[in-house]
Amino acid sequence: MNESYLDDVNDYDDQTGEDELDPVEIPKEVRHLRTQSYDKSVRDLVAMIDEGDIDLDPDYQRNYLWENKKASLLIESILLNIPIPVVYVAENEESQWNVIDGLQRLNSLYRFFKNEFKLSRLEVLSELNGLTYHNLPPKAKRMLGNGMFRVVVLLAETHPEIKYDVFMRLNTGSVRLNEQELRNCLYR
């Protein structure tokens, strides 16, 4: 997505003579946000990451930041059937999904499924503290694998500047990106 995105933006910049676009300035005929929503199980999401269908390391995203406690609480929330916020991804021309919002959540799931951390400081399911995915009771493994995430996909035909605008809007409300992370968005 990175090279094709830059090619699309550069081609448009060459045509307009502008370096940066405001989404309102994009010609109306290409200013369409095309999305599709899916309900994906945790098991499916982990498999998609393993197969390279979801990119957990896009250039424009920050590194993994969550401490084990926060990641553990996400796992506990899934086991307790607590709704998890929507994950937003942008589809590229190869049909790969690049994470726009939800990278920390997906990374936490993936790391847990790969036994990279033990559950810690759980508040409700405290009997699971100290366990990795491998050591979870079979019922808990099934419940976790069957947990559902809503995924909103910005389809490949969506103009790159519209995708960028969505990224900016989603990532200016919670933990703010630093200036370098925001600049990296331009080169995704």
Regions found by a protein language model. Give the residues of each.
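Basic- and aromatic-enriched surface patches that contact anionic nucleotides/nucleic acids
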Residues: N2-D44, P58-R188
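A short, surface-exposed helix-loop junction/capping segment
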Residues: E51-P58
